Amino acid sequence: MRAILALEDGSVFIGSHFGATGTEVGEACFNTSMTGYQEVLTDPSYSGQIVTMTYPLIGNYGVNPEDYESGKAQVSGFVVAELAKVHSNWRATEALGPWLEKQGVIGIEGVDTRKIAKHLRSAGAMRACLTTELTPEEAVEAARKAPSMEGCNIVDKIGSHPMTPEEVDALVTDRELPPVEYDLVAFDFGIKYNILRQLRENGFRVTVVPAHATAEEVLAMKPDGVFLSNGPGDPATLTDIHREVGALIGKVPMFGICLGHQIISHALGAKTFKLKFGHRGANHPVKDLRTGKISITSQNHGFAVDPDTVPDDVEITLVNLNDNTVEGIAHKTLPVFSVQYHPEAAPGPRDPQYLFREFKQMIASRKQ
């Protein structure tokens, strides 16, 4: 069956369908990771996006029950150069194509993903339509009518999934759980399972609360620390969350990742802006301005903190060596810090996992 990817600027790419059928719209973006497609597909941060994988062959190792980053596929569509016809992996339980069909995600193969990525890199991320039923002209028109990611609150659209500490513990299946050292409240803006695993494996008892939990509700739980998760959409739209997080800053140690980093930045008085085509891949070099250390990081974001708006009492700690955008901040006197990238990986390098230990050390210092 024919499938069409149409962009709002009139670009049309025609290929073959796999997965579900129908029509979906979203923001077209690209990911440069060679592996980790299942983690990408199930990452809530990709909600509302049609993702192009630049690696030429996708689906080689199938799908398995262990590599989910949420309970289901989250992307609006999936674009690959070639879908593997045969998958092979000892953990695999299903091929990628049939799994996407069950998940209701439309896929297209047989298109020039290098051309798509280069076009988005030059022209910027844009609205798109992926369809098995519209004409090219109709698909372009559908893309142009799709909502823009800028100004879009997707956190409320995907909803939150509160979890008890016991439910978080159940995510760690491959090793013995360490003793609990600290109680942590984690805000769910679209939290990845591997973040929860990393927090638990670092000695935190984790309770996951909804995105709109109030500062009063969180403080009533008497946590040793607060964590702000990743998530989709425009961080500037989450003004009520900025307010509640601002009310927590200084009262309890705080660590944020990705969208959580952007929310902390807003709560501290900074602003965010939309990147031309975003950072999505597993090989982004980040420099720690305090130590000079370089980490190779996994990233997935379309917005960034504007360095010119960072207040004087906040330090920019990390920058991206590709474009010099802000990758981390820390308050100069209060126990709060955040990073734009994903130290938990899944997929990607594990260089920055030390940040979870730094958070624990911050809490320990605070309690002394």
Regions found by a protein language model. Name each.
Residues D224-G225, S229-I296, A304, G348-R366:
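Cysteine-nucleophile active-site neighborhood
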Residues D112, C258, H301, H342:
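Active-site glycine-centered loops adjacent to acidic/histidine catalytic or metal-binding residues
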Residues M1-E216, A220-M221, P235, A346, ...:
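RNA-binding accessory domains that recognize and position tRNA/RNA substrates
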Residues D183-F187, T297-S298, F337-Y341:
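Active-site-proximal beta-strand elements of phosphoester/diester hydrolases
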Residues I106, D183, P253-F255, K271, ...:
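Proline-centered loop/turn at the N-terminus of a beta-strand
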Residues H17-F18, Y55, Q299, A330, ...:
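Short clusters of small/polar residues that mark proteolytic maturation junctions
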